[in-house]
């Protein structure tokens, strides 16, 4: 009997080794592989725009059309979630992008409809932004979650106060962040952050109150509130802490690829999964309502 109990305890311990426990150094929660040529330190504050990955068009044709496409930026609501909208909106140029918004809990969200205005504010915390190549910014809600919209142009992802990231189903221009932590975005070009041959970021978006703002240093991603960008136990991308949420899988190992996309480890493909009127963002395919996307990095400017 004692032997069986020991085996069960050992099995349970093994399943938790890959996840974060509060007593452990969270900065070691990093994938084993790294993205070739990825930048782990970026000097400027930036946002992200959700770019759907077409399974029918070639990579070369996608590259050809990228500069002319309006992109959706993610917003963040107060809890840290990141969200993106589901529709597209017309935006300005460097390639201008509507920013993803963030709500107060850290979630990131993006809208689902196509409007030229900034993504809607959530009661938590949203972030809005636009432009360089025009893209709708992803929003973040107060809990740190990140969400994004469902359509192909400039809608912004938001983050709510708990750190989750969500995106709406329509395209809006930029993501802004409201007092409760939600993030919404709008669009504009930046004169200060001109792209160079070594700068992987070639899109810009207007920064407004509530825009999901991120910094990348040493492979660690933080939002405007200093919360840690992580992949949590359910594979969702959101911001928490510090320290990150107990059970987090990755809290370091972030980079910007040579193509200007956000990556965790050697992976730059994320999934937007429909949750009501917003998409939540994940690093793995978790269900039938999930589609592959790139999270394009966008410079944020005051407009």
From Swiss-Prot:
Role according to the record: Component of the outer cell wall layer. Required for stability of the cell wall and for optimal growth. Required for resistance against several antifungal and cell wall-perturbing agents and for tolerance to heat shock.
The set of disulfide-linked cysteines is none
At what residues does the UniProt record annotate the site feature described as Cleavage?
A: 72-73
Q: Name one GO biological process term.
A: fungal-type cell wall organization
Q: Where is this site: Covalent attachment to cell wall glycan?
A: 81, 107, 145, 164, 182
Span of the secretion signal? Answer: 1-18
Tell where it localizes. Answer: Secreted, Cell wall
Supply the source organism's classification: Eukaryota, Fungi, Dikarya, Ascomycota, Saccharomycotina
Q: What does the entry report about post-translational modification of this chain?
A: Covalently linked to beta-1,3-glucan of the inner cell wall layer via an alkali-sensitive ester linkage between the gamma-carboxyl group of glutamic acids, arising from specific glutamines within the PIR1/2/3 repeats, and hydroxyl groups of glucoses of beta-1,3-glucan chains. The propeptide is cleaved off in the late Golgi. While both peptides are secreted, only a fraction of the mature glycoprotein is incorporated into the cell wall.
Propeptide segment residues: 19-72
Record-level GO cellular component terms: extracellular region; fungal-type cell wall
Question: PIR1/2/3 repeats span which residues?
Answer: 71-89, 97-113, 114-134, 135-153, 154-171, 172-190
Q: Which organism is it from?
A: Saccharomyces cerevisiae (strain AWRI1631) (Baker's yeast)
Q: What is this protein called?
A: Cell wall mannoprotein HSP150
Q: Name one GO molecular function term.
A: structural constituent of cell wall
Which InterPro entries does this entry report, sorted A to Z? Answer: PIR1-like_C (IPR054508), Yeast_CWMannoprotein_PIR (IPR051153), Yeast_PIR_rpt (IPR000420)
Per the record, the similarity remark reads: Belongs to the PIR protein family.
């Amino acid at each position: 009997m004692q032997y069986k109990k020991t085996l069960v305890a050992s099995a349970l311990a093994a399943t938790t080794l890959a996840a974060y426990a509060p007593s452990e150094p969270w900065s070691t929660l990093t994938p084993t592989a790294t993205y070739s040529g990825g930048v782990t330190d970026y000097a400027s504050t930036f946002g992200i725009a959700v770019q759907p990955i077409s399974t029918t068009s070639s990579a070369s044709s996608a590259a050809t059309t990228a500069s002319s496409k309006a992109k959706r930026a993610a917003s963040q609501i107060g809890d840290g979630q990141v969200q993106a909208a589901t529709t597209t909106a017309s935006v300005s140029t460097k390639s201008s992008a509507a920013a993803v918004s963030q709500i107060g809990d850290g979630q990131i969200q993006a809208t689902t409809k196509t409007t030229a205005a900034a993504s809607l504010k959530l009661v938590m915390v949203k972030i809005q932004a636009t432009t360089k190549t025009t893209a709708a910014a992803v929003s973040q809600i107060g809990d740190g979650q990140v969400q994004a919209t469902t359509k192909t142009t400039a809608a912004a992802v938001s983050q709510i106060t708990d750190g989750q990231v969500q995106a709406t189903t329509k395209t809006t221009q930029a993501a802004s962040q409201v007092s409760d932590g939600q993030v919404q975005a709008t669009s504009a070009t930046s004169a200060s952050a001109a792209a160079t041959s070594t700068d992987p970021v070639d899109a810009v978006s207007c920064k407004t109150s509530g825009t999901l703002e991120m910094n990348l240093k040493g492979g660690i991603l933080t939002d405007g509130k200093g919360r840690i960008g992580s992949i949590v136990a359910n594979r969702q991308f959101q911001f928490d802490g510090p320290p990150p949420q107990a059970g987090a899988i990755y809290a370091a190992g972030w980079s910007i690829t040579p193509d200007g996309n956000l990556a965790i480890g050697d992976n730059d493909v994320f999934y937007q999964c429909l949750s009501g009127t917003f998409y939540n963002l994940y690093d793995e395919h978790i269900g039938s309502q999930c589609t592959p996307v790139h999270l394009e990095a966008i410079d944020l400017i005051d407009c």
